[in-house]
């Protein structure tokens, strides 16, 4: 499994940037996507995929320790849907 450091190394290799500059670029991309999602904006990267915020409805659940029914509040969660080019590349 690749991690953030692996991603930074690949970006540095592909762009001939230093690892420090690549780390700054990767961090900037992640924080920018996060900022758009925090504002409720969808981020569409043609060919790669879409990042968006989805609403999870309130629902009933069970406490696994007691078995008592509990109410789980509605929430917002980040979601990613892969684009066609990414799906095709993985096949």
UniProtKB/Swiss-Prot annotation:
Tell me one Pfam family matched here.
Bac_DNA_binding
User: What GO biological process term is on the record, naming one?
Assistant: chromosome condensation
Swiss-Prot/TrEMBL keywords: DNA condensation, DNA-binding, Virulence
Q: Does the keyword DNA-binding apply?
A: yes
Q: Which SMART domains match?
A: BHL
Q: GO MF terms on file?
A: DNA binding; structural constituent of chromatin
Coiled-coil portions:
none
Q: Name one GO cellular component term.
A: cytosol
The record, for InterPro entries, names: Hist_DNA-bd, Histone-like_DNA-bd_CS, IHF-like_DNA-bd_dom_sf
> Which function does this protein serve?
Histone-like DNA-binding protein which is capable of wrapping DNA to stabilize it, and thus to prevent its denaturation under extreme environmental conditions. Also seems to act as a fortuitous virulence factor in delayed sequelae by binding to heparan sulfate-proteoglycans in the extracellular matrix of target organs and acting as a nidus for in situ immune complex formation.
What family does the entry list? Belongs to the bacterial histone-like protein family.
Protein name per the record: DNA-binding protein HU
Q: Which organism encodes this protein?
A: Streptococcus pyogenes serotype M1
- Which gene codes for it? hup
